[in-house]
Amino acid sequence: MSTPARRRLMRDFKRLQEDPPAGVSGAPSENNIMVWNAVIFGPEGTPFEDGTFKLTIEFTEEYPNKPPTVRFVSKMFHPNVYADGSICLDILQNRWSPTYDVSSILTSIQSLLDEPNPNSPANSQAAQLYQENKREYEKRVSAIVEQSWRDC
């Protein structure tokens, strides 16, 4: 069944294949275009560098008018990521726009890894360490980067 949301997701997938952004990838799951599996590679020059982080993206039939639900499947230690892997990012909530596509969602999350917003913490411990003890924060991030290799 072809719906506007499904047609849009096919376009998003085609665009992602034809013009893949650096450091991110994503594709619909085998039997459901409404559920995607994605990977974000830790940005170079950040504590997340060399990490391989898996995510799931779940769309509704209201996409692109409503944002998808995006969660890290890989363990994540970040000020803006909840314990269940869900992400506190304005474009996935109140600043969503139908002009955003899968590519822009993934690159925005990749940018968030490097530039957390400690004023809107989903993980207060990570936010506190990020602001007050960068060395310990980076140590904790290194541990999840190493764990991401085992999870691949």
From Swiss-Prot:
Pathway: Protein modification; protein ubiquitination
Cellular compartment(s): Late endosome; Lysosome
Domain UBC core: 4-150
Pfam family, one: UQ_con
Entry-linked PROSITE patterns: UBC_1, UBC_2
EC supergroup of this enzyme: transferase
Major subcellular location class: other
Entry annotated with the keyword Coiled coil: no
Protein modification: Phosphorylation at Ser-120 by CDK9 increases activity towards histone H2B.
Keyword tags: ATP-binding, Chromatin regulator, Disease variant, DNA damage, DNA repair, Endosome, Intellectual disability, Lysosome, Nucleotide-binding, Phosphoprotein, Transferase, Ubl conjugation pathway
Mutagenesis / variant outcome for changing residue 7 to A: Impaired ability to transfer ubiquitin to UBR4
E.C. number: 2.3.2.23
GO molecular-function terms, A-Z: ATP binding; ubiquitin binding; ubiquitin conjugating enzyme activity; ubiquitin protein ligase binding; ubiquitin-protein transferase activity
Active site: 88 (glycyl thioester intermediate)
Subunit record text: Interacts with RAD18 and WAC. Interacts with RFPL4A and CCNB1.
Protein's UniProt name: Ubiquitin-conjugating enzyme E2 A
Organism: Homo sapiens (Human)
